[in-house]
């Protein structure tokens, strides 16, 4: 067996995480202490939102991404709820609209000013009332404008048309116990849910029917999570009967057995999965952990491939994930997380090391853009549509530090080169020959440059030969290793 086949090839094997410098963090934020397994954080290309401690009700902070450093205690908040805020979610089709769910049993939708808050925001644009217990889950539809899902501790899932404040669908008989989380599929035709009864369900919200169900997806009693992947499979996190944390991958067509099941460790914190459909990488963050593990999902067994772990010193109380269109593609950034500490928010950048300054097509396929593919009425009528994709190539900015600059200015003359007679036709390259270039000194200068160039070329040829020699040697060693493993040597 060749060693090349033993080590799985992946362009994400060398992804590494890097926290930003202290002056790029958001300091002195009083992160909420409410007991709820939410991310407590939501981010988009314009704003960072964090659920914070508030007296006399619930509040969350909305900061422009550029508002780093220490945040003044008097900085205005969004503070219209009468009970603690449990979950927040930015609208995928409008970077200035955010929804929140609260212990006061309401869902509120807020319009954030273009440049951020200058005074406390107490009046939502829409109040959605329909739950009888606290609302802990908020999820916008991925492709239909103004469609919002909410789930409460009354075990009810409601689908809303935010534009009309109308309750579109009420699903009140599908969950016998507390709902831990919900996740829309790629086009928003279905959603999956994880429930306290240990079941994972796939639900058609417009029909109000159960499409598939897996009882005891994870046998442990602690909270679990379920998310849809782009190809329709379901990824879950949970606990075993012995309280070991687990990951699993399921095929909705056959939920009898998981396609893959992995055990991680014996920590207590719930595992929060963040999925990137463009790269098929799942990032798993444990509440109370100080690490982020990431895995690549493939179509071949064993399906879930561990890539690496980012580890820091401080435990995380929550986590937000930047949408792909908010990343710095010129730095080969494939993910950015916003880690909540006790009193600050720290961005963590995930990067694929690349030597080339060119746009990396393989890292950045077309991704979901901010334009809705459907109106709410179209979705209600039964239509489905995939997200409208955009290219990130326009966001690419070449690194100025690596630009090659060549100057041929003559050190013997500050005068501009004279144009040769008859050489001024449109579009022709301007001549850079000067009178000084024709002198013996100019000839020597050019000869010196040519000599240096030849030295560089010789060194480059030698390096290429060395690389080829090393490559051949590696191949020979791999063949020897393969023969030894097969018992031939």
From Swiss-Prot:
Lineage, uppermost ranks: Eukaryota, Metazoa, Chordata, Craniata, Vertebrata
Modified residues (Phosphoserine): 2
GO process terms (BP): actin cytoskeleton organization; actin filament branching; actin filament bundle assembly; actin filament organization; cell migration; cellular response to platelet-derived growth factor stimulus; endothelial cell chemotaxis; negative regulation of Arp2/3 complex-mediated actin nucleation
Pfam families in alphabetical order: DUF1899, WD40, WD40_4
Subunit structure: Forms homooligomers, but does not form complexes with the other coronins. Interacts with Arp2/3 complex components, including ACTR2, ARPC1B and ARPC2. Binds actin.
GO cellular component assignments: actin filament; cell leading edge; cell periphery; cytoplasm; cytosol; extracellular exosome; focal adhesion; glutamatergic synapse
Listed Low complexity bias regions: 428-441
Gene this protein is translated from: CORO1B
Positions of region (Disordered): 408-444
PTM notes: Phosphorylation by PKC on Ser-2 regulates the interaction with the Arp2/3 complex and cell motility in fibroblasts. Phosphorylation does not seem to affect subcellular location.
Record protein name field: Coronin-1B
Taxonomy, superkingdom: Eukaryota
Record's keyword terms, sorted: Actin-binding, Coiled coil, Cytoplasm, Cytoskeleton, Phosphoprotein, Repeat, WD repeat
Effect of residue 411 to M: In a colorectal cancer sample; somatic mutation
Organism of this sequence: Homo sapiens
């Amino acid at each position: 067996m060749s060693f090349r086949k033993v080590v799985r090839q992946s362009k994400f094997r060398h992804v590494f995480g890097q926290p930003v410098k202290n002056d790029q963090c958001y300091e002195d934020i009083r992160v909420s202490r409410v007991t709820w397994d939410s991310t407590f954080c939501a981010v988009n290309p314009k704003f960072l939102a964090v659920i914070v401690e508030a007296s006399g009700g619930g509040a969350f902070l909305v900061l422009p991404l550029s508002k780093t450093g220490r945040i003044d205690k008097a900085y205005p908040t969004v503070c219209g709820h009468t009970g603690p805020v449990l979950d927040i979610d930015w609208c995928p089709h409008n970077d200035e609209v955010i929804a929140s769910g609260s212990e006061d049993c309401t869902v509120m939708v807020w319009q954030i000013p273009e440049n951020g808050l200058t005074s406390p925001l107490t009046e939502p644009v829409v109040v959605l009332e329909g739950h009888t217990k606290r609302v802990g889950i908020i999820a916008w539809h991925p492709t239909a404008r103004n469609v919002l899902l909410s789930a409460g501790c009354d075990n009810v899932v409601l689908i809303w048309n935010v534009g009309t404040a109308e309750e579109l669908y009420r699903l009140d008989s599908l969950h016998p116990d507390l709902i831990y989380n919900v996740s829309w599929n790629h086009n928003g035709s279905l959603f999956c849910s994880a429930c306290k009864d240990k079941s994972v369900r796939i639900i058609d919200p417009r029909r109000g029917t159960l499409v598939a169900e897996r009882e005891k997806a994870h046998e442990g009693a602690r909270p679990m999570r379920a998310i849809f992947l782009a190809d329709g499979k379901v990824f879950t996190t949970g606990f075993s009967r012995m309280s070991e944390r687990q990951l699993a991958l399921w095929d909705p067509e056959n939920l009898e057995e998981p396609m893959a099941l992995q055990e991680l460790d014996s920590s207590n914190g719930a595992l929060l999965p963040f999925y990137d459909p463009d790269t098929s990488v799942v990032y798993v963050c444990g509440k109370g952990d100080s690490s982020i593990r990431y895995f690549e999902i493939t179509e071949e067994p064993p399906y879930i491939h561990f890539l690496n772990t980012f580890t820091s010193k401080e435990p995380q109380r929550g986590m937000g994930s930047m949408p792909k269109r908010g990343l710095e593609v010129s730095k080969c950034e494939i993910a950015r997380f916003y880690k909540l500490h006790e009193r600050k928010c720290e961005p963590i950048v995930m990067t694929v090391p690349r030597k080339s300054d060119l746009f990396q097509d393989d890292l950045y396929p077309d991704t979901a853009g901010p334009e809705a593919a459907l109106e709410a009425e179209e979705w209600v009528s039964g239509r489905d549509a995939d997200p409208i994709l955009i290219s990130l190539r326009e966001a690419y900015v070449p690194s100025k530090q690596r630009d090659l600059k060549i100057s041929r200015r003559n050190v013997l003359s500050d005068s501009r080169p004279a144009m040769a007679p008859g050489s001024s036709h449109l579009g022709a390259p301007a001549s850079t020959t000067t009178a000084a270039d024709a002198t013996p000194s100019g000839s020597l200068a050019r000869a010196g440059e040519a000599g240096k160039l030849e030295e560089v070329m010789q060194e480059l040829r030698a390096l290429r030969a060395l690389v080829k020699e090393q490559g051949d040697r590696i191949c020979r060693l791999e063949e020897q290793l393969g023969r030894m493993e097969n018992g031939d040597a």
